[in-house]
Amino acid sequence: MFKSAAENYEIIRFMEHGNRWHPAMDCVQGELLIDRVRRCPEGEKEEGFGWIRQLAQQLERFHRCRSGQCYRYVNPYSVMITRDGQIMLLDLDAQSNAFVLKNMQKRAMRNHFVKPLLHIRDHTRLFADFYGFGKTVQFLMASTIPDPPLTRCESRKLYRITEKCLSEDPKRVYQ
C-alpha cells in the first residue's frame, strides 16, 4: 500500500476530552494525499468517500479548536494519509512542513486551490477552507479511478457538495 520509504510529517492530532476537542502536535509516518493519488490512482470507492468524510471531520475539529480560525491552505499537499489510512492535516506552523507553504507560492497551485482575495466575502471567515475542500474533492474525483465506478446519484451528490463549497452566491454557500 505504501511506498517503501514513507516519510515522517508533523501533523495536528485532535484529542477528545469530554465533548471538546484539543489540538496536539505529533510526528506520524505516512504520505501526502497528492503522492498517494499519483502513485496509485485506482482504489475502492468507499476509500475515497472515507477520505472526503475524514477531511471534513478534521477541518471541523480544527475550526472548533481554534475558535473558527481558518486552516488556510486545504489542498492535496497539506493532507496526509497515515499507514492505517487515516486522513490528517499537516501542521503548517512546523518548520519541517514549510514545503507546503512553498508549494502554495507556485502559480498553478494558487490558481487552482486558493480563492483570489478579491472574491472572498466577509460573510464567513472559513470560506477559504470550504473553497480548498471543494477543490480537493474535485481533485480526488478527477485523479482517481474508483472501483466500482460512481453511480449517477453519487456523482450528483459530490457535484452539489463541490458546487456549494466553490459558490460565490451567499445563499448557496456552506456556513
What residue ranges belong to the model's regions?
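Conserved short submotifs of the Hanks-type protein kinase catalytic core
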Residues: G18-L32
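Activation segment signature within eukaryotic-like protein kinase domains
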Residues: W51-I52
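Conserved HxN/HPN-centered segment at the entrance to the catalytic loop
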Residues: K3-G18
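C-lobe/activation-segment region of protein kinase-like
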Residues: Q86-R160
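A conserved short helix/loop substructure at the end of the activation segment
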Residues: L166-Q175
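AlphaC helix of the protein kinase catalytic domain
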Residues: L33-G43
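Catalytic-loop of the protein kinase fold
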Residues: L59-T82, L89-D91
